[in-house]
Design a protein with these regions (language model features):
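Cofactor-centric catalytic regions
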Residues: 1-2, 6-26, 38-144
Length: 144
């Protein structure tokens, strides 16, 4: 998974903490989370890293984006297996029902804390302040 962050790690360990949060939410080893730190050309504004504020604000955005990504993965997996979305589950690498569908069978996606975005598929955008999610086509690129 790729985790693109808008927060700046100034020795506070936020890159590591956000990767830990994403790994926990996605039920995957932390080694499967690749962190891309802030890029001022594409990242939204961040007011800075103060005390533990980044963990609470960006951490919540990471959790919400991961939960939304899991829902999207389950929905796509259910469609591919032609079963009801509520009858499938996701274990961090596979969507399963009576049969198992590996992510590599149909998913090309990008999981990110503040914003997920990639070339094809779907994207989950998350505003860390308001938690509003814009309605748009989503993108993902998942690889291990």
């Amino acid at each position: 998974y790729t985790l693109a962050l808008g927060c700046t790690d100034m020795g506070t360990g936020c890159d590591t903490v956000m990767a830990q949060i994403a790994a926990d939410c996605l039920n995957t080893p932390m080694d499967n989370i690749v962190v891309f730190s802030v890029d001022t050309d594409i990242s939204p504004y961040d007011s800075g890293s103060y005390a533990s504020a980044t963990t609470y604000t960006t951490g919540v955005a990471v959790m919400k984006a991961c939960e939304e990504l899991k829902k999207k993965i389950c929905k796509l997996g259910a469609e591919m297996m032609e079963v009801d979305e509520g009858k499938v589950d996701f274990d961090g690498s596979c969507v399963f029902y009576d049969e198992t569908l590996e992510i590599s069978d149909g998913a090309d996606g990008n999981a990110a804390g503040h914003m997920t975005d990639a070339e094809e598929g779907y994207s989950v955008d998350m505003d860390a302040i308001s938690s509003e999610m814009p309605r748009r086509k989503f993108h993902w690129k998942i690889s291990h």
